[in-house]
Amino acid sequence: MGLDKDGISNIAKERIASSLVEDTKDLAAELCKHFYNQGWVSGTGGSITLKVLESDVDVQERLIVMAPSGVQKERMLPVDMYVLSSDGTVLSAPPAKGAPHKPPKCSECCPLFLKAYKMRNAGAVIHSHGLESCLATMINPTAKEFRITHMEMIKGIAGHGYYDELVVPIIENSAREYELTDALAAAMEAYPKATAVLVRNHGIYIWGDSWISAKTQAECYHYLFNAALKLHQLGLDPADAKHGPLTRPQTLPDFANKRATSKNVFVLDIEGTTTPISFVTEVLFPYARENVSSFFKSTYNSPETLNDIRLLRDQVHEDLRNNVPGATEIPVESAGIDAVVAAIEKNVQAMIKADRKVTALKELQGHIWRIGYENGELKGSVFEDVPEALAKWDARGIKTYIYSSGSREAQKLIFGNTNFGDLRVYLSGFFDTTIGHKREARSYKEIFLTLGVDHPSCITFATDVLAEAVAAKEAGLQAVLLLRPGNAPLPSDHGFRTAKSLLEL
């Protein structure tokens, strides 16, 4: 089988150039305009993807047409569409446009779309940012499901009738779209009848066995969300068969007591606090350093890796402007994979050697480590007191968060694959440097505002780095320095409380 320089076979090229693909691109562009007029994809948000109707190919193996990210959907043209293989490999990308357009980028929804294709055998997936889909998740900010019954438009949802109760799972939002992938997959597995998943304060993912089914259901879902909002405004219950008056939850008086038991919060550093420094310096960093080249060569055309390359290009451009040692120009794509990967590897090695805390590096390391955890080459390491402390705090209603310079994905991988099992059940959230540098007080102020506690002093931040403790204290947090084996010595006059174990907190 002949392959071109990008590793695309001649057969795949013929499929990409077929009239079926062109027709699907035309349809995708037309639907983008329609959805824009519906208010579902304004501000470049939202997206759509369609399977190419290749009747002689199994649905799971058919080509995928996908709208790009960050593009005005009402001005979308067929040429703007990406063509992907069934596993998400980019086979055809749109040409770059001149200013003021940004370089084309495949939708960050891609990993979520692929889950719907794989788990539901979908023929089309729509991601809407329609206001009603956001507000529907806010009716009850603690609800994990949206429910409605006895409404005519329920009949438009696959597998449902007028008398059925429509249940749509709700997952929590994150700053980056692809971080929702695992939560979306879990919801799809837990709700086998569902044809949609709501994302709180964000929007909805809807799929069907064809574009007609997905579009029809999308229209019905948005209608039903609007209906539920209006029923609530009238004091009526959309989940009641007679849509009678809403009843106040009996547990409401307990809210104050629950708040009292959980008003204090722990925020933990990882390296030198929950995890030995040696694990990071002697295991994680070397693994990432040794696998940069193989990672890029094996995943080069995936949307996630293309985004890694974009972030690295941006960082290198900034480094070159600032004369950062070790920065090397990354050649354009036309130079070929080998040249691009070689330049990327030089830059990444220099960043790792200098222990740079930049997002581009941390995101990439997280993706490389993920492969290591998945194939069993890596296992997270935490001190013996960590699982016991986390379990005790959780039992007392105290929430625990992680704040590390490593990406949130890397943090989840460590705690999801530890020598004591999966500890993520005890953690309420993860912060990385996208919220700010760990040695800057404003970062901790942002964490305080995000967590919603009454006062910064309700937060105890545990770290092994004096400069981080100083920044946290400046923001009003309680700071504790951990004295772990292998940690750097502290000056005698540091002035902070110390602990040798999280159990002492």
UniProtKB/Swiss-Prot annotation:
Cofactor(s) this protein cannot do without: Zn(2+); Mg(2+)
Residues annotated as binding substrate 2: 404-405, 438
Substrates-to-products reaction catalysed: 5-(methylsulfanyl)-D-ribulose 1-phosphate = 5-methylsulfanyl-2,3-dioxopentyl phosphate + H2O; 5-methylsulfanyl-2,3-dioxopentyl phosphate + H2O = 1,2-dihydroxy-5-(methylsulfanyl)pent-1-en-3-one + phosphate
Residues annotated as binding Zn(2+): 127, 129, 202
Coiled coil start-end: none
InterPro entries found in the cross-reference section: Aldolase_II/adducin_N, Aldolase_II/adducin_N_sf, Enolase-ppase_E1, HAD-like_sf, HAD_sf, MethylthioRu-1-P_deHdtase_MtnB, MtnB_viridiplantae, Salvage_MtnB_euk
Alphabetized Gene3D superfamilies for the sequence: 1.10.720.60, Class II aldolase/adducin N-terminal domain (3.40.225.10), HAD superfamily/HAD-like (3.40.50.1000)
Location of region: Methylthioribulose-1-phosphate dehydratase: 1-237
Record flagged with keyword Ribonucleoprotein: no
Cofactor note: Binds 1 zinc ion per subunit. Binds 1 Mg(2+) ion per subunit.
GO molecular function per UniProt: acireductone synthase activity; magnesium ion binding; methylthioribulose 1-phosphate dehydratase activity; zinc ion binding
Region described as Enolase-phosphatase E1: 266-505
Pathway: Amino-acid biosynthesis; L-methionine biosynthesis via salvage pathway; L-methionine from S-methyl-5-thio-alpha-D-ribose 1-phosphate: step 2/6; Amino-acid biosynthesis; L-methionine biosynthesis via salvage pathway; L-methionine from S-methyl-5-thio-alpha-D-ribose 1-phosphate: step 3/6; Amino-acid biosynthesis; L-methionine biosynthesis via salvage pathway; L-methionine from S-methyl-5-thio-alpha-D-ribose 1-phosphate: step 4/6
Keywords noted in UniProt: Amino-acid biosynthesis, Hydrolase, Lyase, Magnesium, Metal-binding, Methionine biosynthesis, Multifunctional enzyme, Zinc
Alphabetical GO biological process terms: L-methionine salvage from methylthioadenosine
Top-level taxon of the source organism: Eukaryota
Active site (catalytic residues): 152 (proton donor/acceptor)
Residues that, per the record, bind Mg(2+): 269, 271, 464
GO CC list: cytoplasm
Residues annotated to bind substrate 1: 109
Family per similarity comment: In the N-terminal section; belongs to the aldolase class II family. MtnB subfamily.
The name this protein goes by in its record: Probable bifunctional methylthioribulose-1-phosphate dehydratase/enolase-phosphatase E1
Lineage, uppermost ranks: Eukaryota, Viridiplantae, Streptophyta, Embryophyta, Bryophyta
